[in-house]
Amino acid sequence: MGRKWANIVAKKTAKDGATSKVYAKFGVEIYAAAKQGEPDPESNSSLKFVIERAKQAQVPKHVIDKAIDKAKGGGDETFVQGRYEGFGPNGSMVIAETLTSNVNRTIANVRTTFHKNGGNIGAAGAVSYMFDNTGVIVFEGTDPDHIFEILLDAEVDVRDVTEEEGNIVVYTEPTDLHKGIAALKEAGITEFSTTELEMIPQSEVELSPEDLEIFEGLIDALEDDDDVQKVYHNVANL
């Protein structure tokens, strides 16, 4: 899965460059998690996980605290998760995951974004069957066999463990992501650069320069939408 991890890194790096967007989207995700349970990460595991991911993305503490304080203060916004699937040029596939306080607005915006950027939105399940929902854990290390043994002993359902450029990359069943993180922490590994659920394509396509330009415009437009939290695709050369 090495190449797949390389693509995830490339997408994260490109997205993380737009820091204000990243901060704002994590702020919404933290607020929503805090509103759904206690606004205390020690008693709300979902909130704790989002905060850990925000820290990995270098979201400042004041942004995290502001979102939690808003939830504590009785903010009345309710956010709903969504997923929209569609197609770009020449066999390219896209999944956009959303978190919104206005579903009608989000549906209209995502549909318009696809149509204006050479794509077509599909029905639920139109492309997601070609992606594997996967837990991804990344940390510094060079001994994947040792890490695999740790996870095996902890009865974590692991799909693969690889070493990529001085990093260990663990792929788990989505239901075992948190179990995998806990097992690694128990083994003394406490610093992670990524702990995410990712939709990883089962196969990839390469686009011509002309099609790639169109497709890149579609991805950029989706990622610029404030309601879109994550965008996944199957294009190898983006």
From Swiss-Prot:
Subcellular localization, as worded in the UniProt entry: Cytoplasm
Record-annotated disulphide pairs = none
Could you confirm whether the keyword Transcription regulation appears in this record?
A: yes
Q: Which Pfam families does the record cross-reference, listed alphabetically?
A: TACO1_YebC_N, Transcrip_reg
- What is one process in the GO biological process aspect for this record? regulation of DNA-templated transcription
The terms describing its cellular component in GO are: cytosol
Which keywords does the record carry? Answer: Cytoplasm, DNA-binding, Transcription, Transcription regulation
MF terms in GO: DNA binding
Main site of residence?
cytoplasm
Q: Transmembrane helix as a keyword?
A: no
Q: Which family does it belong to?
A: Belongs to the TACO1 family. YeeN subfamily.
Q: What is this protein called?
A: Probable transcriptional regulatory protein YcdB
**Organism field:** Lactococcus lactis subsp. lactis (strain IL1403)
